[in-house]
């Protein structure tokens, strides 16, 4: 009888074999759900929420976030996989598959009486060897546009259909190349993702500038300005109450008039400064002048600015202030005391676009923009969400490739090569831990197997072909998903991120090891004692 039972008769306990069976069945269950959506030929899942909202996706991360998982072990695996996405942006489905398969392979040996500790020692040895081998097969190369496009395409094709993936690939790579500075880390926040419910998803495009999701607030302001100076500021151009609660007493109407005038004058002086600057830089030329303010602009000020032909946008989002100065140049001002032409940015074209009730302001044709916008278009909400998730992963894939300075061949090529290397390494491991290494090698093959299966080919036949080709040629050979034949992944431009594979080997081994070593599950928390 479990010791915990004597202390708490209501506790639920699962011992040794039962505990392991519970955990392994959870891992298998999760693996079966995600198995079919691995790779570019994977199938979609439809998630229907309690409110009846529909989400169509084959992104493992989105699925694991949205699915309500009751089983504690399964939710542990799901958390590991979503953490993988947070760190590297890819590899969630592979993560779940490999953990499930490691446990499945281990189960075969444990059912024959092998102790889990011995298998986990084998797993550790295999992981160390696999990481060494990964160092050998990684391909260090110049991260030019072609390579980055291959990396992004490999990632994006697993999230959305091929035609859309090709459109997004170019946009994603060009956006990263635009914001990239030498010897500085890439800041993905400098790529704004703006959505428009409009046209079809293949109209998604890269705007080399900014798109703001609001328009000018005055009917007389121009809807299109070419060759414009841009003043970015965070200065209030409306009457604001004083910070302390103060009251003014006046004896006559004249005094009240004076008070109102004094209050207005404060704002009018600021507006005059903008107008003077505009006259100074534009003169009589037809150059435009645009003010983008983070705070409010009241109707009087808008009117004064409109008369001078200045376009003014108020209440711009804070995150866009930094992006504006990076895209157009200039300096964001917090006061107008030292207002001079050096503070101004420049854009070749600023125009307003109205879509139903919504207005968008496009700031384009900037010289050498350091911040860009990906304009996501799609006919409905769930298409937009799907594209946004895909773009985020695509951006991360390109960033990882640049940060790593190297890539590894995809299409299951690395897994096949790793499995073969581990089988060769197996005899040098002492004792029964060899079985753990064998289990690890077999588990890695789940990736090429499932890739082939999802494409409609026989998984054993395809795997045998690929392994034979790998042994003969010595090259890293993956599965060609359109024919089911072996192919040299590097020649076809199928590349995966090195850091994703490295993270996969680490996290899968750690979690599988921990789950195998569980020999007792107790549900004896405070909540289960009530009743």
Swiss-Prot record:
Hydrolase found in the keyword field: yes
Numbered residues of crosslink Glycyl lysine isopeptide (Lys-Gly) (interchain with G-Cter in SUMO2): 251
Binding site for ADP: 39, 91-94, 158-159, 411, 496
Stored SUPFAM superfamilies: GroEL apical domain-like, GroEL equatorial domain-like, GroEL-intermediate domain like
UniProt-listed PROSITE patterns: TCP1_1, TCP1_2, TCP1_3
Localisation: Cytoplasm
One of the GO BP terms on file: binding of sperm to zona pellucida
Pfam families assigned to the protein according to its UniProt record, in alphabetical order: Cpn60_TCP1
Residues involved in Mg(2+) binding: 90
Any one cellular-component term (Gene Ontology): zona pellucida receptor complex
Keyword tRNA processing set for record: no
Catalysed reactions, as listed in the record: ATP + H2O = ADP + phosphate + H(+)
UniProt binding sites for ATP: 39, 91-93, 411-412, 496, 501
UniProt-listed CDD domains: TCP1_zeta
Keywords assigned by UniProt, alphabetized: Acetylation, ATP-binding, Chaperone, Cytoplasm, Hydrolase, Isopeptide bond, Magnesium, Metal-binding, Nucleotide-binding, Phosphoprotein, Ubl conjugation
Residues modified as N6-acetyllysine: 5, 199, 287, 365, 377, 388
InterPro entries: Chap_CCT_zeta (IPR012722), Chaperone_TCP-1 (IPR017998), Chaperonin_TCP-1_CS (IPR002194), Cpn60/GroEL/TCP-1 (IPR002423), GroEL-like_apical_dom_sf (IPR027409), GROEL-like_equatorial_sf (IPR027413), TCP-1-like_intermed_sf (IPR027410), TCP-1_chaperonin (IPR053374)
Primary localization: cytoplasm
Tissue/organ expression: Expressed in all tissues examined.
Membrane-spanning parts: none
Residues recorded as bearing Phosphoserine in the entry: 205
EC number: 3.6.1.-
Family: Belongs to the TCP-1 chaperonin family.
Subunit structure and binding partners: Component of the chaperonin-containing T-complex (TRiC), a hexadecamer composed of two identical back-to-back stacked rings enclosing a protein folding chamber. Each ring is made up of eight different subunits: TCP1/CCT1, CCT2, CCT3, CCT4, CCT5, CCT6A/CCT6, CCT7, CCT8. Interacts with PACRG.
Biological role: Component of the chaperonin-containing T-complex (TRiC), a molecular chaperone complex that assists the folding of actin, tubulin and other proteins upon ATP hydrolysis. The TRiC complex mediates the folding of WRAP53/TCAB1, thereby regulating telomere maintenance.
Name of this chain's protein: T-complex protein 1 subunit zeta
Organism from which the protein derives: Mus musculus (Mouse)
């Amino acid at each position: 009888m479990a010791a915990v039972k004597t202390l708490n008769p209501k506790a639920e306990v699962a011992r040794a074999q039962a505990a392991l069976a519970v955990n392994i069945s959870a891992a298998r269950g999760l693996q079966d759900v995600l198995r079919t959506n691995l790779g570019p030929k994977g199938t979609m899942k439809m998630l229907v929420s309690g409110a009846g909202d529909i989400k169509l996706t084959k992104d493992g991360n989105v699925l694991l976030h949205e699915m309500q998982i009751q089983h504690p072990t399964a939710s542990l695996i799901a958390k590991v996989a979503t953490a993988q996405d947070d760190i590297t942006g890819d590899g969630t489905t592979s993560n779940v598959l490999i953990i499930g398969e490691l446990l499945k392979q281990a189960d075969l040996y444990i059912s024959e009486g092998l102790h889990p500790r011995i298998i986990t020692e084998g797993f550790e040895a295999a992981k160390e060897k696999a990481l060494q081998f990964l160092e050998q097969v990684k391909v260090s190369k110049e991260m030019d546009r072609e390579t980055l496009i291959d990396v992004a395409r490999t990632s994006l094709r697993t999230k959305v259909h091929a035609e859309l993936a090709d459109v997004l690939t170019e946009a994603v790579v060009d956006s990263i190349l635009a914001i990239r500075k030498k010897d500085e880390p890439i800041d993905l926040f400098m790529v704004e993702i703006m959505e428009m419910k409009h046209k079809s998803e293949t109209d998604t495009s890269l705007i080399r500038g900014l798109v703001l999701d609001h328009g000018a607030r005055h009917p007389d302001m121009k809807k299109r300005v070419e060759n414009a100076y841009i003043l970015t500021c965070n200065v209030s151009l409306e009457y604001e109450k004083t910070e302390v609660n103060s009251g003014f007493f006046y004896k006559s109407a004249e005094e009240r008039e004076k008070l109102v005038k004094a209050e207005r004058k404060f704002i009018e002086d600021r507006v005059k400064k903008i107008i003077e600057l505009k006259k100074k830089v534009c003169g009589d030329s037809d150059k435009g002048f645009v003010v983008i303010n983070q705070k409010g602009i009241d109707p009087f000020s808008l009117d004064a600015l409109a008369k001078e032909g200045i376009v003014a946008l108020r209440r711009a989002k804070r995150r866009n202030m930094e992006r504006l100065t990076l895209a157009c140049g200039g300096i964001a001002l917090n006061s107008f005391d030292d207002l001079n032409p050096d503070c101004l940015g420049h854009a070749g074209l600023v125009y307003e676009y109205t879509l139903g009730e919504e207005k968008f302001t496009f700031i384009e044709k900037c010289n050498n923009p350091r911040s860009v916008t990906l304009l996501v278009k799609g006919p409905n909400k769930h298409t937009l969400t799907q594209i946004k998730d895909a773009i985020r992963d695509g951006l991360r894939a390109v960033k990882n490739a640049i940060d790593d300075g190297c890539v590894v061949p995809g299409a299951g090529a690395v897994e096949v090569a790793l499995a073969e290397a581990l089988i060769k390494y197996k005899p040098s491991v002492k004792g029964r831990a060899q079985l753990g290494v064998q289990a690890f090698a077999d588990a890695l093959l789940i990736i090429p197997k499932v890739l082939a299966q999802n494409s409609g080919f026989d998984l054993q036949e395809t795997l045998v072909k690929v392994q034979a080709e790998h042994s003969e040629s010595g090259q890293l050979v993956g599965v060609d998903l359109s024919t089911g034949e072996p192919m040299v992944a590097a020649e076809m431009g199928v590349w995966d991120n090195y850091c994703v594979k490295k993270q996969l080997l680490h996290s899968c081994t750690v979690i599988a090891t921990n789950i195998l070593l569980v020999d007792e599950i107790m549900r004896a928390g405070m909540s289960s004692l009530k009743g």
